[in-house]
Amino acid sequence: MEEEEPEIRELQRPGKGTNTRIPGHDRTHICQAIAELRGALGEESISTDDEDLQSHGYSEWSSINSERLPVAVAYPKTTEEVSRIAKVCSKYRMPMVPYSGGSSLEGNFSAPHGGMCIDFVFMDKILALHDEDMDVVVQPAVQWMHLNDQIKHAGLFFPVDPGPSAKIGGMVGTCCSGTNAVKYGTMKNWVINLTVVLADGRIIKTRRRPRKTSAGYNLTGLFVGAEGTLGIVTEITLQLAVIPEVTTVGVVSFPSIRHAASAAMQAIRMSLPVQAMEIMDEVQMGVINRAGGTGKTWKEVPTLFFKFAGTKAGVKESISLAQSIAKANSGENFQFSKGEQEMHALWSARKEALWSMVSLRKGAEQIWSTDVAVPISRLADIIGMHILQP
């Protein structure tokens, strides 16, 4: 009896007329690759379901979506299974796209040439915590907030804090940052080593666990930020930080975006010891009020958010310096949290910004979200350009 050929549909991305066929790739080869992987990993390990393909190739909150979708989604459970997937895809010349949290706003998991999406949903374990060495070994689908919940008993935390739903694999692939970047830097500063499956299925480890090494090339740095183009990351060893004795949040309002930007620049030049510093204009503050997700009505003016962390004495001194800088730049209505609950309430305005905009969409309106980078001296200019040219 002949084996039934896997069903490959001509799916379209929402609003587009382009199908998922891979240019220059034979349909028979695609079917053979899927059948071979199902035989090796199990029928349930490879999906060609319409909804799976849509959800793994398109994001409604991203302004950058490919016109194509993957032709199949693989669900490996081990590094060895990822290696097997890579070998088969290499054999049949199928592109591969790794997928962890799907929270990208920049089209990082889109499949412009179709191919195989590799979803790490079943590789979500914390493999080892070395509290004395202050590091942890995780799989790519571990969510960073869940990681911090699991290791806080050791007095440690992972300080890179992008969107709440982000997972470690995608954070490595994009070399992400977050609000804590002012003090702790970005993802590349916290990755010790990686286990990587190369395009032909070979498995490599980029380096050993000791912090200091001068043996060989900096392969770890090569893969961090490569977005899966050089290999598929299946295991990550992360450096951890000590949970600060005290953490508090401060919020201050300004009459204009230039006043707020000037205060931010002065804070950096004076080495104000903050864990995070974020600026939001009057438009964003108004959006947050209309969405109503923070449980607080905010003054709709340019606003700076500070997060202070350290010893009690150090935080007290930092708050005093921040107040002086704000006052010198016409800042007013300075608030700072007096407990953990109030701290989360104040900081929620920054974290809820994107979701507030999403909730206020009308009909088929799209949210255009992206990152821009300018020298700190041009911060006010770039925000001003956005306001003048909405």
Which stretches of residues belong to each language-model region?
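Generic structural signal for well-ordered, non-membrane alpha-helical segments
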Residues: 26-34, 75, 79-82, 140-147, ...
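N-terminal flexible segment immediately upstream of the FAD-binding catalytic core
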Residues: 1-87, 91, 104-134, 284-293, ...
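FAD-binding subdomain of flavoenzyme oxidoreductases
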Residues: 125-278
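C-terminal substrate-recognition/cap domain of FAD-linked oxidoreductases
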Residues: 3-8, 47-57, 242, 248, ...
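Glycine-rich, histidine-containing beta strand-loop boundary motifs that form or position
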Residues: 98-102, 109, 120, 140, ...
